């Protein structure tokens, strides 16, 4: 089978190398990519597009699926998506469900609620007009992901929520392509995908 991996927020495809290797050993062909604003080739980490970045994130994955189908002459593409990747996968399924044989959603984020999303839209729109779409707001970052660590008892770092394995957390913290934050326009795009 053929598996398309869609990674999570503020990380990159290389974090999935060991997992992809296990899938390959099990007989799967795996295609990974960095989402816009992620990974070593991103022009600006945490930034997708000045406008409609959400649409581009979806379009990119549709193009990757088309590439897999054409390159490997298959109709049976499976998705493995993690965290923010599951939000993208869920959106793809709303319009492209016929394109995927199976979908695995790992670490699907909790919906923050309509009120939080409305506040997020208000803040990101205001800050985009005042500071520009590439501006990074500590307030928006805190409102969007700041509570993730509250579920971890005796947290030692701000990223303990990502994994119970301390070595994985330390590797994440040391990785220059992880935990870089999102621009206000990227958070706006994320809210668009969540609604």
Walk through the language-model features, giving the residues of each.
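Alpha/beta-hydrolase active-site loop
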Residues: 50-70
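Glycine-rich nucleophile elbow surrounding the catalytic serine of serine-hydrolase chemistry
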Residues: 81-91
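Alpha/beta-hydrolase fold nucleophile elbow
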Residues: 72-83
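Conserved alpha/beta-hydrolase
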Residues: 15-45
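Active-site glycine-rich loops that stabilize anionic/oxyanionic intermediates
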Residues: 3-11, 84
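Active-site nucleophile elbow and catalytic-triad environment of alpha/beta-hydrolase enzymes
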Residues: 182-195
């Amino acid at each position: 089978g053929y598996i398309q991996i869609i990674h999570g927020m503020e990380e990159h495809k290389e974090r999935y190398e060991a997992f992809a290797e296990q899938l390959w050993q099990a007989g799967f062909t795996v295609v990974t990519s960095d989402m816009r604003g992620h990974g070593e080739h991103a022009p600006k980490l945490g930034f997708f597009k000045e406008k409609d970045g959400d649409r581009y994130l979806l379009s990119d994955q549709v193009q990757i699926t088309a590439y897999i189908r054409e390159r490997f002459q298959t109709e049976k593409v499976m998705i493995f998506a993690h965290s923010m990747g599951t939000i993208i996968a869920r959106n793809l399924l709303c319009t492209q469900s016929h394109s995927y044989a199976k979908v695995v959603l790992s670490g699907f984020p909790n919906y923050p609620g309509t009120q939080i999303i409305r506040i997020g839209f208000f803040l990101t729109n205001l800050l985009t007009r005042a500071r520009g779409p590439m501006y990074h707001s500590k307030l928006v970052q805190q409102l969007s992901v700041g509570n993730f660590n509250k579920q971890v008892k005796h947290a030692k770092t701000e990223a303990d929520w990502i994994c119970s394995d301390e070595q994985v957390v330390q590797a994440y913290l040391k990785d220059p392509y992880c935990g870089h934050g999102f621009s206000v326009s990227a958070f706006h795009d994320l809210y668009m995908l969540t609604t």
